[in-house]
């Protein structure tokens, strides 16, 4: 198996249905979009009605719609998540992008599951595990190089997805707790404060300013 043996598919993020339509009209093969809840961007949610109207539009152009449910769930959110997955399945979406492995234990309809980049997929072993438990597509950690991507691709039957444009976190995907430690807002709950992108002043052990108001983490 080689990288060139498969047709490349171009995916685009979309904050809302209007942006999703434009992405499809401009050539995206698939769009991933937040649903009513449990997405990693809590300010980019869309109603079931919006998604239900978007799906036939996408399919008319041969494109797919993936919905993100890629946050870590609390125990009391498992049943609501299960209901939401059933509702999304009924809208006709093509797949769900998830992070929490607890979803595998839920009684859900036969919908494709994609492993989010928040799953921190950096090794062949993790990629094989996710493929073996039923994920049909895995979104690799953004920190990998081409050699690492190739090794994972050759070791698993799952479709490989990789980010080629956009913001790059300074931490490993899904493993950053700066926001939660500093503000109580968790990146794994869709509420990152993006503390790494703020300017900081660095001082040495004598209190002398080494760098003033610079973006030291990003």
Where are these regions (language model features)?
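Internal, well-ordered domain-core segments that constitute the primary functional module
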Residues: 115, 119-160
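Active-site pocket-lining/capping segments in soluble small-molecule metabolic enzymes
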Residues: 2-121, 153-218
């Amino acid at each position: 198996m080689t990288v060139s043996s498969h047709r490349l598919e171009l995916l685009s993020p979309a904050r809302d249905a209007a942006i999703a339509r434009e992405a499809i009209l401009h050539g995206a093969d698939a769009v991933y979009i937040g649903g009513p809840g449990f997405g990693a961007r809590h300010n980019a949610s869309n109603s079931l009605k919006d998604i239900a109207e978007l799906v036939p539009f996408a399919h008319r152009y041969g494109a797919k719609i993936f919905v993100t449910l890629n946050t870590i769930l609390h125990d009391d959110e498992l049943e609501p998540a299960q209901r939401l997955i059933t509702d999304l399945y009924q809208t006709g979406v093509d797949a769900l992008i998830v992070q929490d492995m607890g979803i595998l234990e839920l009684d859900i309809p036969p919908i494709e599951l994609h492993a989010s980049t928040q799953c921190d997929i950096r090794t062949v072993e993790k990629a094989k595990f996710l493929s073996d438990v039923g994920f049909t597509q895995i979104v690799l950690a953004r920190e990998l190089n081409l050699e690492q991507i190739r090794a994972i691709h050759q070791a698993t039957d799952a479709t490989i997805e990789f980010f080629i444009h956009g913001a790059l976190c300074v931490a490993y995907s899904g493993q950053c707790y700066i926001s939660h430690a500093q503000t109580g807002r968790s990146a794994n709950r869709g509420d990152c404060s993006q503390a790494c992108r703020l300017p900081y002043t660095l001082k040495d052990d004598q209190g002398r300013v080494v760098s003033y108001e610079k973006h030291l983490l990003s």
